[in-house]
UniProtKB/Swiss-Prot annotation:
Keywords: 4Fe-4S, Cell inner membrane, Cell membrane, Electron transport, Iron, Iron-sulfur, Membrane, Metal-binding, Repeat, Translocase, Transport. Pfam families: Complex1_51K (PF01512), Fer4_7 (PF12838), RnfC_N (PF13375), SLBB (PF10531). Its EC number is 7.-.-.-. The keyword Iron-sulfur applies. Its cofactor is [4Fe-4S] cluster. GO terms for biological process: electron transport chain. It is an enzyme of class 7 (translocase). [4Fe-4S] cluster 1 binds at C378, C381, C384, C427. This is Ion-translocating oxidoreductase complex subunit C. Belongs to the 4Fe4S bacterial-type ferredoxin family. RnfC subfamily. The gene is rnfC. One of its GO terms (cellular component) is plasma membrane.
Length: 773
């Protein structure tokens, strides 16, 4: 079985799927040789004329530059410099419309030529075989050479990807696009330089075989190459004319029957493809030292009076070429297309400059090239799928692209589309399919860039967050270490930490306060127990209202303790907040606290002053307890007085114990007084009746009885007044008791007074009756 190289040398060819045979119309521009276009009045040089990044500026406005002088510099392999096409002055650096389907503006250098054609110093390398591949790649990169037959990929970067792994070098001379003849005429006139460029690339890549693929519609170019390549180990293979056989993947399929893997490049399968225009530029850059400052441009279409190929300086406005070579616009449908009718795009205006990838300016009439503005609905005929050279599904791709379903477009391998235009050419509905695909690709590319930028921003944020946390931890460690060093230093000096000392002082003060609080708790518990016992006793005796005097005392005691704790907390706060306070401040705080305590004690003493006069309490006695004791003493006094006044029932009053409640004592006293008055009235009445019945008795003296009754009434009134005063004063001393009911006491006192008055009135009426008698 023959190897692949042997099959190629034997002349075997293969074919790719799909493809079309459009009307070529190449004879308009390939009949005349290439001539130099005139130097225009202004050159517009975009900083980015290739796939990749724009270079960094080396010039500024007002600088004079020489022909071939670098205007930008590169810092990465995807950057290419641009050079001055002629000598002149930099008049502006500003955005201008560039050659792109979008019609957008990019930063450009505007050069005003001085028509002197003064060259920059060149460094030719005619003996290139003595140079290393790396040196040659660097010279190619410095010359700013990019792919001149396709998308404009940097040539040095492409060659570098095939170092030490290229087996077959393929030279693309097919030029399958209708109307375009730039490569055809270039091969006719500059075949020797093209062969020199091939030899330079062979010296860099060292392939096993070199193949030149050229369509059979270029017989003169084939003859020129065969003559220039005599005695050279190269294979010139003439292939059938079929569009798009000039595509990289399609030409590889035709010549080698190999297919580039999905998402891969030809170097992955040991192949390298270069355009004849790029090879001629490589020869000029290495052998003559000239950078890429001009290219061959085809001026064709029925609107040109003299269609031909010209050497145009990069940056030449299209309008200058139109004016020089007899362009006459169509009156009804003026159009200018950069590129061919299949893959080209319409220019927004004629001031767009020529770039490294601009190989043709097509100016057709409306009859020569019809417009595709009459888009109709898809009829699902399937011709687009049959014509696709990449075996895609153009119909489904157009649907998803129109609906902006870009995820589905990617699933259908939209990125593999070479935008050849074969599908749009055969579409009976005249749907501009390539435009939909270009827009979808641009949107997908934009979203991909945004996603990458978001990922980079996320990574930067996470790195920043980690750095901030790391810095925070380092600061905390530094602070801890510094505090530890200070503590050790103070300990060595015999001192102590001020903060620790303040904390110890606060703890000591709290420890001093704890015993006081603990001593109060048993008293509170005892008071609560007494209150509960009295409430239970009241409930058993059937009293309508329980006795809540103990709860009142308990609340008052709690309030007093709260005031004392508040004063003590104030002293503790002052002590803790002022670590370095002197003895004077402490003395002032203590004096203020003592003054507050004395004031509170005086207020409580004044409220119980009058009851305390009867029974003076000791210095340590509680004013509330003193008031209770005074009330009990008054009740005992009244009971003793009642015992002396009424001898009829001396045992009815039951003296209360020292622990009696003042309210109960008051109620008992009132009841005793009422009973005494009632007994007095009964005694008076009984005395009056026997006196009337036996007026002549020796023991009954009416005058003495009247005097005795008057004395009794006077004593009763006096006792009532003293009782009223003594009852009013304790009530005023404790007006805020929640459990005591002042209204009931007042009602009882009023009832007692009313009964006393009634008894007095009855005794007076009896006395008057006796006097009348």
């Amino acid at each position: 079985m023959l190897s692949l190289i042997e099959q190629i040398k034997s002349g075997k060819l293969w074919d790719f799927p799909g493809g079309i045979h459009p009307f070529e119309n190449k004879h308009q521009s390939n009949r005349q040789p290439i001539i130099n276009a005139s130097i225009p009045n202004e050159l517009v040089l975009p900083l980015k004329q290739h796939i990749g990044k724009a270079g960094d500026l080396l010039v500024k406005v007002g600088d004079r530059v020489l022909k071939g002088q670098p205007l930008t510099q590169y810092t990465s392999t995807f950057m290419l410099p641009i050079h001055a096409p002629t000598s002149g002055v930099i008049s502006a650096i500003e955005p201008r419309t560039v050659a792109h389907p979008s019609g957008l503006s990019e930063l450009c250098i505007v050069l005003t030529p001085d028509q002197q054609e003064e060259w920059f110093e060149l460094q030719p390398q005619p003996d290139f075989q003595q140079l290393t591949p790396e040196t040659l790649l660097e010279l190619i990169r410095q010359a700013g050479i990019s792919g001149m037959g396709g998308a404009g990929f940097p040539t040095a970067k492409k060659l570098q990807s095939g170092l030490s792994r290229t087996e077959i070098l393929i030279i693309n001379a097919a030029e399958c696009e209708p109307y375009i003849t730039a490569d055809d005429v270039l091969m006719r006139q500059y075949a020797h330089e093209i062969i020199q460029g091939i030899e330079i690339v062979e010296h860099i890549l060292k392939p096993k075989l070199t193949i030149i693929g050229i369509e059979d519609n270029k017989p003169e170019a084939v003859a020129a190459l065969q003559q220039a390549a005599q005695d050279k180990p190269m294979v010139i293979r003439v292939i059938p004319t079929k569009y798009p056989s000039g595509g990289e993947k399609q030409l590889i399929k035709i010549l080698t029957n190999l297919e580039v893997p999905k998402g891969g490049i030809p170097a992955d399968i040991g192949l390298m493809v270069q355009n004849v225009g790029s090879l001629q530029a490589i020869a000029r850059a290495i052998v003559h030292g000239e950078p890429l400052i001009r290219r061959v441009v085809t001026l064709t279409g029925d609107c040109f009076r003299k269609p031909r190929n010209v050497w145009a300086l990069l940056g030449t406005p299209v309008q200058a070429l139109l004016n020089e070579f007899g362009y006459k616009a169509d009156k009804k449908l003026p159009r200018l297309i950069m590129g061919g009718p299949m893959m080209g795009f319409t220019l927004p205006h004629a001031q767009v400059p020529i770039t490294k990838t601009a190989n043709c300016i097509l100016a057709p009439t409306r009859n020569e090239l019809t417009s595709s503005d009459n888009e109709m609905a898809c009829i699902r005929c399937g011709q687009c799928a049959e014509a696709c050279p990449v075996s895609l599904l153009p119909q489904q791709l157009q649907w998803h692209a129109k609906a902006e379903e870009f995820d589905k477009c990617e699933e259908l391998d939209l990125k593999d589309c070479i935008e050849c235009g074969a599908c749009a050419y055969v579409c009976p509905s005249e749907i501009p399919l390539v435009q939909y695909y270009r827009q979808a690709k641009a949107e997908i590319r934009t979203r991909s860039l945004e996603a990458e930028a978001a990922e980079r921003a996320k990574a930067r944020f996470e790195e920043k967050k980690a750095r901030m946390e790391r810095d925070k931890a380092e600061r905390e460690n530094r602070f801890k270490q510094a505090a530890e060093d200070r503590r050790k230093e103070m300990q060595q000096q015999g001192g102590s930490d001020a903060i620790a000392a303040a904390i110890e002082r606060v703890k000591a003060q709290k420890a001093q306060l704890e015993p006081t609080d603990n001593s109060v708790k048993p008293a509170i518990a005892a008071a609560i127990a007494r209150a509960k016992a009295k409430q239970a006793e009241a409930a058993q005796s059937g009293a309508s209202e329980p006795d809540n005097s103990e709860m009142a005392k308990l609340r008052e005691e709690r309030k007093r303790q709260a005031r004392e704790r508040k004063a003590q907390k104030g002293e503790v706060t002052e002590a803790s907040t002022s670590d370095g306070a002197d003895d004077k401040k402490s003395a002032v705080a203590a004096a203020i606290a003592r003054a507050k305590a004395r004031k509170a004690e005086q207020q409580e003493t004044e409220s119980a002053a009058q009851p305390a006069q009867a029974t003076p309490s000791s210095d340590d006695a509680d004013p509330k307890k003193a008031a209770v004791a005074a009330a009990i003493a008054r009740a005992k006094a009244r009971k003793a007085e009642q015992g002396t006044e009424s001898t009829a029932q001396p045992a009815q009053a039951t003296p209360s114990s020292d622990e009696a409640d003042p309210k109960k004592a008051a109620v008992a006293a009132a009841i005793a007084r009422a009973k005494a008055r009632k007994a007095e009235q009964q005694e008076t009445e009984s005395t009056a009746q026997p006196a009337q019945a036996t007026p002549s008795s020796d023991d009954a003296d009416p005058k003495k009885a009247a005097v005795a009754a008057a004395i009794a009434r006077a004593k009763a009134r006096k006792a009532e007044q003293q009782e009223t005063k003594s009852t009013a004063q304790p009530e005023q001393a404790t007006p805020s008791s929640d459990d005591a009911d002042p209204k009931k006491a007042a009602v009882a006192a009023a009832i007692a007074r009313a009964k006393a008055r009634k008894a007095a009135q009855q005794s007076s009426s009896n006395l008057n009756a006796e006097e009348k008698d």
